Structure formats: C-alpha cells, structure tokens
Amino acid sequence: MTKGILLGDKFPDFRAETNEGFIPSFYDWIGKDSWAILFSHPRDFTPVCTTELARLVQLAPEFKKRNVKLIGLSCDSAESHRKWVDDIMAVCKMKCNDGDTCCSGNKLPFPIIADENRFLATELGMMDPDERDENGNALTARCVFIIGPEKTLKLSILYPATTGRNFDEILRVVDSLQLTAVKLVATPVDWKGGDDCVVLPTIDDTEAKKLFGEKINTIELPSGKHYLRMVAHPK
C-alpha cells in the first residue's frame, strides 16, 4: 500500500480488528458484488462523531437497499468502540421518527475498525495534521471512501475534525455512482434519484439518439453549442 489513494485506484485489501471481531480480509468482508463505504472519525466519545454515527445508524437501511456495506475506523481500541455504542444509539433514538426501528436495540449495523497503531489511516491518507490526542498523537480526519464491487475507489471525501459530514449527501452520491456505472449518463447539480440526467459529452448526437431515442431535450445556450442535453432518468 502507498500513502494515499486516488480515484480509480485498486483499494488495498487488509486485515483489521473491529468492535465485532477480527476481519481477516477486507475484500472477503465486502463480498463479490457489494459496494462498500469506509469512513473514519477522529475519536470515540466526542460530540460531532457521535452525531455522525447516530445518523449513519438511521440511514443504514437505505445503504443496505443499495447493496452498500458500511465500516468505520478510528485510532481508538475495539473495547472503546464497544463502550461507545450505547451513546451512539441513545443519540440516534433522540432523532428517530415515530415508528422507526433502525435505532432499536444496542448494536450498530456496521463494524468500526480499531486502527490503534494508525497503520491503515496513515497508508490511506486519513490523518488530520491539526487534530491530536492528549499525548500528541495525530487523529484521523472525517474521511469517506466509496469502493465499487471491483474494489476500486469511486469517491473520496476528506473533512476536518471540526466539520460533521452530511450522510444524506453520501447516499445521494451513491445513487449517482451506481446509476452512472451502468448507464451512459451523468447527473447534474443537485440531482436526486429519479431526476433527469444529462447525456455524456463524449457521446455524439447520432449515438445519443440510438441510446435515448427522440426524448432528448437539448438546451439552447448563447454559445450555440449543443452540449447540455437532458434525458429522463434511465430505467
């Protein structure tokens, strides 16, 4: 493994200890056809991290519907992760709507890696140089890696410790990535599942008509260039 990973790179396989036990192979844990999201947080028992993971618990059923497996990571111990679960679930229950079952029980719907020696976090470029523990050791940033079924990196996001992530946005991005992995379209600004898409600029008009028929809405622009071509969400 090298320090840091770029879009399109093969994501490394690794072994890891988690709050749910030892994972001998990250690839085997993901499986052959699933997507995966590896997300790091700076530290257990901290306010922003607790609210983030509570939201992920709420959204876990939505990720599962999309065949996405979730796994967390920080430099805390597996035992610390296990003790933290009750706090996460308590915050989750505070934010649950009536009838929600995602926050019931006292078990997270995803494991959290205990990267105490900071090996994975360092090699994957997850460290935040501005955040340190009481001993001066660097802590992980709020990183998100989305990994496709072929085990390549599809998206990476790196937030500082002071800024919590919007996991509804991560869910939206998954919808876009999964759609554009199988359809020759791109998703425009603020797109949500079911919204119109745009034809890829690499596809000429003749090929676009073969793919999408006559239902292409070409937007007239001052430049006279016909690159903004809208199509309905592909089935």
Swiss-Prot record:
Its EC number is 1.11.1.-. The keyword Oxidoreductase applies. The active site is at C49, C49 (cysteine sulfenic acid (-soh) intermediate). CDD domains: PRX_1cys. Belongs to the peroxiredoxin family. Prx6 subfamily. Thiol-specific peroxidase that catalyzes the reduction of hydrogen peroxide and organic hydroperoxides to water and alcohols, respectively. Plays a role in cell protection against oxidative stress by detoxifying peroxides. This is 1-Cys peroxiredoxin. It comes from Dirofilaria immitis.
